[in-house]
Amino acid sequence: MTSTYAHAPGFVAGDRPKIVTSRFEFADSYTIERYLATNGYAGLRAALSQPAASVHDEVKNATVLGRGGAGFPAGTKWGLTPQEVWPRYLVVNGDESEPGTYKDRLLMERDPHQLIEGCLIACYAAGLSQCFLYIRGEMALAQERVAAALNEAYAAGYVGKNILGSKFSVDIVLHWGAGAYVVGE
């Protein structure tokens, strides 16, 4: 049985190439070497080659949707950032506490550089210089892989000061949850 999505006319589940999960089949999918070998950070390079407002408009016009249950348009969300308030931050919630949900966990465990690149592009488009990335306490492998990927990205010049020789700088701060007892009390 196939299903269609009202917000993506013409889309039938299962009839498109894998985009988010395309690297999952590789045993070393979480490394910077695999990420770069499969065109990783090309989106960041492309974003930095144009004005931030153009990147924001491109995401908005492409109707890129969030991965949460509401499918909120990313370009719209990025536009909600108050322009007159400083400092501004990107906060990424990797808690994924909905029962039976593993979409974010798999991305963090198997392709953390894709998450980091997305954070960087969002920060660039929205004019942000710091990102806080929260990962649920029970997700030890996700924590390990994201931390290792972030160290690789800093060492390679994808995160930090003057990214890839540009005037754009972003720091990403990782925060681990402590775990939950029943419902987090």
Give the location of each predicted region.
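Feature of Fe-S/electron-transfer and energy-metabolism proteins
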Residues: M1-E185
